[in-house]
Amino acid sequence: MLNETPALAPDGQPYRLLTLRNNAGMVVTLMDWGATLLSARIPLSDGSVREALLGCASPECYQDQAAFLGASIGRYANRIANSRYTFDGETVTLSPSQGVNQLHGGPEGFDKRRWQIVNQNDRQVLFALSSDDGDQGFPGNLGATVQYRLTDDNRISITYRATVDKPCPVNMTNHVYFNLDGEQSDVRNHKLQILADEYLPVDEGGIPHDGLKSVAGTSFDFRSAKIIASEFLADDDQRKVKGYDHAFLLQAKGDGKKVAAHVWSADEKLQLKVYTTAPALQFYSGNFLGGTPSRGTEPYADWQGLALESEFLPDSPNHPEWPQPDCFLRPGEEYSSLTEYQFIAE
């Protein structure tokens, strides 16, 4: 189903809202602005329906937040240090968007664009976007698509694809936030498992500084499920950024059929499993969500949503030595990244 809103987006046109439904009764809502996930409502075994995603009260309210709620991120998700990288001996300077660094593709990233609806029905929608040579400092013309698909086993399947006519780092993701308790509550009470042996420490600006580190013996060891609060702010790597905001190099190594992460609501009525072909997941515990508009009368507070962003490791264009696929896309190649979020009602 496709609807247009009376409210106008920054380009002066209505927001276009799309609804996906499956045979299990799950309903997902999206909009074309930012190719954004707005809502995911899952029927529980007790007959109630639970909202699993953070979101705003109306499409236009998304212009009043800086948390990237549910948005498609590109060309390059996460941070690039000092907004520059070197490729084939040439230094490329990008548009900074967080201090001196570039975050999530620049000040006018893909989250702030209207994506075109290529096709859609009750089960899937395909969005497309063109990004010109020099956009946010990136070289080459880039064509991108994202397909959202809702399956009958309650998976939101997200496939990003891109092509370029000049070599360019490409790292697309969705910045959806989850609260499986279905309300404005503290996600640190969720139980979390991340199947990763290494994580990437960062400085206060979120920039990697010492390379990958084993999770063993640290508060970053989520290989066995644990309550997020159990070791929250337990070491300096967390305290630098007010909690968890770190990339984990996954054991799955790009195998999208293996579970990358598993989340349980505090009341254990809803679970989430994450599958991805991306090499890493960025676990963000919502450390700076405070003041973000919500669906209710009160804004979100810090730690009321968590993100599990599938991606290359942050600042990968400056670290070709890291054990993951090359983040540079070249002419004649296709970037493709698949992530699935599966909800399991108890």
Swiss-Prot record:
List the catalytic activities from the record.
alpha-D-glucose = beta-D-glucose
Which organism's genome codes for this protein?
Escherichia coli (strain K12)
Q: What is this protein called?
A: Aldose 1-epimerase
Its cellular-component GO annotations read:
cytoplasm
Q: Where does substrate bind?
A: 79, 245
Q: Which GO terms describe its biological process?
A: galactose catabolic process via UDP-galactose, Leloir pathway; glucose metabolic process
UniProt keywords (A-Z) are:
Carbohydrate metabolism, Cytoplasm, Isomerase
- Pathway as given in its UniProt record: Carbohydrate metabolism; hexose metabolism
Q: Which gene encodes it?
A: galM
Q: What is its EC number?
A: 5.1.3.3
Query: Member of which family?
Result: Belongs to the aldose epimerase family.
Q: What does this protein do?
A: Mutarotase converts alpha-aldose to the beta-anomer. It is active on D-glucose, L-arabinose, D-xylose, D-galactose, maltose and lactose.
GO function term, MF aspect, one: aldose 1-epimerase activity
Q: Which residues form the active site?
A: 175 (proton donor), 309 (proton acceptor)
**What PANTHER family does UniProt report for this protein, alphabetically?**
ALDOSE-1-EPIMERASE, GALACTOSE MUTAROTASE
TM ranges are none
Q: Where in the cell is it found?
A: Cytoplasm
Task: Name the PROSITE patterns for this protein.
Answer: ALDOSE_1_EPIMERASE
